[in-house]
Amino acid sequence: SEERIENTVLRVLNVEAGARLKVYVETCVHCGLCSEGCHYYLSHDKDPRLSPAGKVKQTLWEMIRNKGRVSKAFMRQAAVIAATQCNLCKRCAMYCPFGIDVAYLMSVVRRITHLLGLTPQYIQATAHSHSVCMNQMWVKEDEWPDTLQWQEEEARSEIPNLRIPLEKEGADVM
């Protein structure tokens, strides 16, 4: 319901997110310098809607401006933007003259959409896999050695001397 949406948005914005969110929202001057750091924006013909500021403007700023009073259709679209158009890499923060962490802002959108049950199913499944197995492939701890040995054998067709060190003290790990 729209009441549930409003309550959820306001709880996350006012209770969970706090001062950091407020500082970022009040500091951003919408200059667009963050855009040059966003690979998604750059790879989509520099569409302004896909710039970091554009994504936040279409999602979080609307929620703030409307004090949480947004439609379910709006929230569905916000979930798509937050889950598929930003991978939270934080490159935009490196380009922002004020150091605004747009990834944090988009993670707030993800949190809200998650609480409303709007996170895309494949992302929910991946998150569940991580919480259960600590990886996205449902590989259980006792299956890791066999899995890594299999990957090592497969990769040797391209890199003949490849070795994945298991239980080797001081091994370089990527």
Predicted regions and their residues:
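N-terminal cysteine/histidine-rich coordination modules
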Residues: 2-30, 35-75
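Iron-sulfur-cluster electron-transfer modules
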Residues: 16-18, 22-25, 57-174
